[in-house]
Design a protein with these regions (language model features):
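Alpha-helical transmembrane segments of integral membrane proteins
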Residues: 78-85, 156-164, 225-232
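Hydrophobic alpha-helical transmembrane segments
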Residues: 133-150, 216
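Membrane-interface loops
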Residues: 105, 142, 154-222
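Aromatic-anchored segments of alpha-helical transmembrane domains
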Residues: 91-93, 168-172, 235-244
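Membrane-embedded catalytic cores of phosphoryl/pyrophosphoryl-handling enzymes
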Residues: 64, 72-76, 188-289
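N-terminal transmembrane-helix/juxtamembrane module of multi-pass inner/ER membrane proteins
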Residues: 57-137, 177-179, 183-189
Length: 289
């Protein structure tokens, strides 16, 4: 993998600037939380992994309109049925939470005893990492990803990203005001307002990093890097959810509900993308061969 300038020079400049004509600038400011810097660096790595396989600038010069990029002979099949299953699971979980089920009460108490402690190192980590799931941060991260996909002329993938994120977060707002569950009464370690179920941080992170998992499967050729990135993307929402419980602003059932909702919209969104874009393009490629 060849970079256009040394990492030392890029660090000195204070931002990463890839090929200037085609690529967006990802700025890393000293005031940014460590978690955000890690995310941007990983996103940059994803770009270079894709660029290494395709020579994107040259390819995009020779492409009119949308460029169909896919780096796997067997993309994930239609996810409609798993999506419907997750819809049912989410509906049952939301019903249990809204009814004040004893099962949910026991579940929350059990997980809280395991997760919460007052270790200063854990508190510092949780306060920093939880910022990665803030609404403003998730919005910025989504916009960055959306712009990168537009620059690549991946219009279908870009609108898949935007559609999933808008629907997931919009539906989250509706459910919050339908269930109206109050947050834990224990002292919060970070500021949080609004209703508790489902966790907006968990919804947003599960949706965004679920999208990144899909894009990594579709676009990254190397099995090693594909596997590594998928593991890393999966860890982000898990850790964000953990921090929301740790800083006392959500019950574990809020976090689990958020994960389920986010994954549901990724599965349903990919089903739409597969039927109306990937499958037709794959068939078109086979006919040309």
């Amino acid at each position: 993998m060849t970079l256009n300038c040394s990492l030392t020079r890029m660090a000195t400049l204070g931002f990463f600037n890839t090929r200037r004509v085609h690529n967006p600038i990802l700025r890393l400011h000293s005031s940014q939380p460590l978690s955000e810097k890690i995310f941007l660096l990983l996103l940059l790595d994803l770009y270079f992994l894709i660029d290494n396989d395709y020579n994107l600038p040259q390819m995009l010069k020779n492409t009119r309109g949308s460029a169909f990029l896919i780096n796997t002979k067997r993309p994930p099949k239609d996810t409609l049925i798993p999506g419907i299953i997750f819809v049912v699971i989410y509906a049952v979980w939301a019903a249990l939470v809204s009814s004040g089920s004893q099962f949910i009460h026991n579940f929350d108490n059990t997980v809280i005893k395991i997760v919460c402690n007052t270790n200063p190192a854990n508190v510092a980590f949780a306060k920093d990492f939880t910022n990665l799931g803030n609404t403003s941060t998730i919005t910025i991260e989504t916009i960055i990803l959306f712009i990168i996909l537009l620059v690549f002329k991946q219009y279908a993938y870009a609108w898949f990203t935007a559609g999933v994120m808008i629907c997931a977060n919009g539906y989250n707002w509706i459910i919050k005001h339908a269930v109206m569950r109050h947050r834990p009464t224990i002292k919060h370690l970070v500021y949080a307002d609004g209703y508790s179920f489902p966790s907006g941080h968990s919804v947003g992170s599960a949706a965004l990093f679920g999208i990144l998992i899909i894009l990594t499967i579709l676009l990254v050729k190397s099995k090693f890097w594909k596997t590594l990135l998928i593991i890393i993307w999966a860890l982000f929402p898990i850790l964000i959810g953990y921090t929301r419980i740790f800083v006392h602003v959500h019950y574990p059932s809020d976090v689990l509900g958020g994960w389920i909702e986010g994954i549901t919209f990724v599965l349903l969104g990919y089903s739409f993308l597969y039927h109306f874009y990937i499958e037709p393009k794959m068939l078109e490629m086979k006919r040309k061969q």
